[in-house]
Amino acid sequence: MLWPNGSLSEWKQERFAALSDLLNSGVRAVRETSPKSKIMFHLETGGDAAKTRGWFKNMFAAGLTRPDGIGLSYYSQWSGPISNLEDTLRVVSGEFGLPVAVAETAYPNSSATNPKPLLDPARSRLQGFAFSASGQAAYATKISNVLRTVAGSRAIGVWWWEVFSPNAKRATITLGPSALVYSSLVTGDGKANPAMVALGKASR
């Protein structure tokens, strides 16, 4: 967030105050120009309840305006087991009473290897969720159910990253060709994987 001004490389009062000022300026701009728009702060701490709690306590103490919702990133490779996500959702929705989304997540649908994989199979694997189309669908269902169960009426939804990267020719993100191929929700010929269907059912 506009480094170095908004950097929290050190958790000091003045750093939280600086970041709060930046975020509040953004909130005011949205409220003034598009008052019907909803504002979400996106944190990458979906697997770290303690860090999430500390972030909010310090930011609200520094005068941060409450947003309309919070988005959390959750990837098993970096965030650990799903129970970590559950704990963090409880912090956001329970302790702070904020609507919450899993704003970024993914899980491989194949154990095949990529030239430059974003999700490392060895570090991403969760017990009970195979690297297969059905395993990916089970993961999507589980994440949706966890969000709904923990956050209840404060659950916003689940966003997948990256939905449309079906083959090496089309995957053009900066991490390299095919980096996200096996976390896609579509097949190489553009058909929906079971996980996309699962997410659709969960949203109803």
Which residues make up each language-model segment?
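Structural preference for beta-strand elements that scaffold enzyme active sites
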Residues: 36-40, 66-71, 99-102, 155-159
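Short, surface-exposed loop/turn motifs that are enriched in glycine and acidic residues
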Residues: 74-79, 129-133
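Aromatic-rich peripheral "rim/lid" segments of glycoside hydrolase catalytic domains that contact
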Residues: 4-14, 87, 91-94, 110-204
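Active-site beta-loop-alpha junctions enriched in small/polar residues
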Residues: 1, 42-47, 72-77, 105-108, ...
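Aromatic-lined glycan-binding groove of carbohydrate-active enzymes
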Residues: 64-69, 81-82, 88-117
